[in-house]
Every structure is written in C-alpha cells, then in structure tokens.
C-alpha cells in the first residue's frame, strides 16, 4: 500500500472574486493518478453543497417579461444579475432576504437584508440602477443544495407568486488536473497528480478538497459497512438507459448571449441547452424577432463553448 499525501502548493484570490488553489498528490502507483483525478473532479463539481437565491418576489411585477418604471434594467436583466450573487450559509434551512431602496440609487448585493447566518461573498455585485425617486422592493427566497438546479426544481409549487431563478449551488467553478511520472529514491516509477481548483469564494480550495475527501471516504465506508442487496432477476434483465447529453440541463444563461438573442429564446420557452437542441438551424431562425445575426451568435457560441453543432 503506497503512502501518498496531498499538499497545497498555492492559494490566491483572482480578479473575478474567485479563489484559486493548486494541490499535488505524490507517491501514487502508475495508473492511480487518472483514477483519483477523475474522482476528485467529479465530486468537487457535483457533490459539494452551497447556497443560492432560488426565487424573488418583486413589488408590482407579475412575470419576468415586465418592466418597472424608473428602473434601468428590465426584469430579465435583474434576474440574471441576482443569479450572480454568491452566498454562504451556516445552515441548510430555507431562508428569506429583503431589499427596499428608494432612488435614485445604484443597487448592489450589500443592499440586501439577510439573516445573520447568511453572508454575501461579493457584496459589490451589481443588481440594478434606479433612475428616479421610485422604490425597488424585492423579497428573496434562499435555499441550499448541490449542483445546478433549473427554475422550478428548487422549491414547492405553492410559491406561485415568486419569479424563479436557476440556482448555481456549486461552490467549485472549475477543476483541472494533470499527471507527471517521476522516479522515487528506489528508482521505482511513481505518479504525481496536480489539482487546479477555482471556487466562487464561498469556500476556499483547501476547504473544498477537505469536503470532497470526507465525501469520498463516507461513500466507500458505506460499501464496507453495509451488505449490498441481492439483485433480482428483473433488475438483472433491465438494460442501461442511453447516456444523456451532459449539457442538456445547462441553462441558456450560461451561454452569455446578447440581450436580444436571449430574450427571443426565453419568449419561445427555450430555457436550457436541451430545449435548444430540439431546434434545427432553419426552425430557430423562424422564431419571432430572431434574425440571422442572432442565429449566427447562437451557433458560434454553442460550437465554441460546448462543441455542439445544431443538426438540420
């Protein structure tokens, strides 16, 4: 059994507000680097919990296509801005926040009144501009979870008066890894695994690695402590379902399209990449107010960001 260990090589804040950290795991046997690297990457991106705004109730607003007199942004733009607020919480309970501000004023995240157990990581994050003496009043619904949840998947159907927001609970934004082969003092071939981790600031890369390690240990411990149930003949005869496109549930907001292209897609109820893949290039250009320029923007963004080409 090899005595491998992990060490933090560097950790620093970057301009976007993210925190970057680099780690190395040494003394791995050949072939272990790719296994451990993939395992850590998967857990860091998918299984760590976080907190996010999942819905808002704005005074005088009924739907996301509305506008508010005296507010520079429309509701869709405000919802997109709110999605970028990074929160961290000491509890996983459902919580509420409030904002009430009279203009003229520039509204940022630090204007939101929150429970004492919730902290805003990026308090200077821009929300909206009030150009007149009007009042902007918003109530926020805040939840904890893992991964990425589309609007409508996060809270109960009783909250019909809330405008729902796609929630990014993931504290880890990006993970890269690479493997180096080296010879130890005994001239045996070993591997070094380098992990590069970027978080949104709600936790440090060191905390992310610790949480991921605990998750992995807990997962495999359960396999040791519990007997696996016997497979029935019916379950043995079931075939595996076809793998889904990994990009299907990604919201179109992640494409960072122009406001015109984005609004056209939302009005056509195209909310995710999966919805977008149902359209051929010709059918997409038939959408109302969706011209050739917007279509080219969507095609180029899909190809460059996700490697997706819409089929005819």
UniProtKB/Swiss-Prot annotation:
Organism (species): Trieres chinensis (Marine centric diatom)
Question: What note about domains is in the entry?
Answer: The N-terminal domain is essential for RNAP assembly and basal transcription, whereas the C-terminal domain is involved in interaction with transcriptional regulators and with upstream promoter elements.
The record's principal subcellular location, in a coarse class, is plastid
Query: Which family is it part of?
Result: Belongs to the RNA polymerase alpha chain family.
Q: Please explain the role this protein plays, according to its UniProt record.
A: DNA-dependent RNA polymerase catalyzes the transcription of DNA into RNA using the four ribonucleoside triphosphates as substrates.
Protein name (database record): DNA-directed RNA polymerase subunit alpha
| Keyword flag Transferase | yes
Q: Where is this region: Alpha C-terminal domain (alpha-CTD)?
A: 243-312
Record's SUPFAM superfamilies? Answer: C-terminal domain of RNA polymerase alpha subunit, Insert subdomain of RNA polymerase alpha subunit, RBP11-like subunits of RNA polymerase
* InterPro entries in the record: DNA-dir_RNA_pol_insert, DNA-dir_RNA_pol_RpoA/D/Rpb3, DNA-dir_RpoA, RBP11-like, RNAP_asu_C, RNApol_insert_sf
- What keywords were assigned to this record? Chloroplast, DNA-directed RNA polymerase, Nucleotidyltransferase, Plastid, Transcription, Transferase
The EC number of this protein is 2.7.7.6
NCBIfam families given in the database record: PRK05182.2-2 (NF003516), PRK05182.2-5 (NF003519), rpoA (TIGR02027)
Q: Which reaction does it catalyse?
A: RNA(n) + a ribonucleoside 5'-triphosphate = RNA(n+1) + diphosphate
Show the Pfam families listed in the entry. Answer: RNA_pol_A_bac, RNA_pol_A_CTD, RNA_pol_L
Compartment(s) where it occurs, according to its Swiss-Prot or TrEMBL record: Plastid, Chloroplast
Q: Name one GO biological process term.
A: DNA-templated transcription
């Amino acid at each position: 059994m090899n005595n491998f260990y992990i060490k933090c090589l560097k950790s620093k804040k970057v301009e976007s507000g993210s925190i970057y950290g680099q780690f190395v795991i040494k003394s791995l046997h050949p072939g272990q680097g790719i296994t451990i690297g993939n395992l850590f990457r998967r857990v860091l991106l998918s299984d760590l919990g976080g907190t996010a705004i999942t819905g808002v109730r704005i005074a005088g607003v009924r739907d996301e296509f509305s506008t508010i007199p005296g507010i520079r942004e429309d509701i869709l733009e405000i919802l997109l801005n709110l999605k970028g607020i990074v929160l961290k919480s000491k509890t996983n309970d459902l919580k509420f926040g409030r904002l009430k501000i009279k203009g003229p004023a520039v509204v940022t995240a630090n204007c939101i009144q929150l429970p004492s157990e919730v902290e805003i990581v990026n308090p200077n994050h821009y929300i909206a501009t009030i150009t007149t003496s009007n009042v902007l009043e918003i109530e926020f619904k805040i939840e904890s979870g893992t991964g990425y949840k589309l609007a409508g998947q996060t809270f109960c159907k009783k909250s019909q008066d809330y405008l729902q927001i796609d929630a990014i609970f993931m504290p880890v934004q990006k993970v890269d890894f690479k493997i180096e082969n080296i010879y130890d003092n005994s001239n045996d071939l070993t591997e070094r695994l380098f992990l590069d981790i970027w978080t949104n600031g709600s936790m440090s890369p060191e905390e992310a690695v610790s949480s991921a390690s605990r998750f992995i240990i807990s997962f495999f411990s359960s396999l040791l402590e519990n007997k696996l149930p016997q497979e029935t003949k019916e379950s043995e005869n079931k075939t595996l379902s076809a793998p889904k496109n990994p990009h299907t549930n990604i919201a179109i907001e992640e494409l960072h399209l122009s406001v015109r292209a984005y609004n056209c897609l939302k009005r056509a109820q195209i909310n995710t990449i999966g919805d977008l893949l149902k359209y051929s290039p010709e059918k997409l250009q038939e959408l109302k107010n969706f011209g050739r320029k917007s279509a080219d923007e969507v095609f180029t963004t899909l190809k460059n960001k996700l490697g997706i080409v819409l089929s005819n």
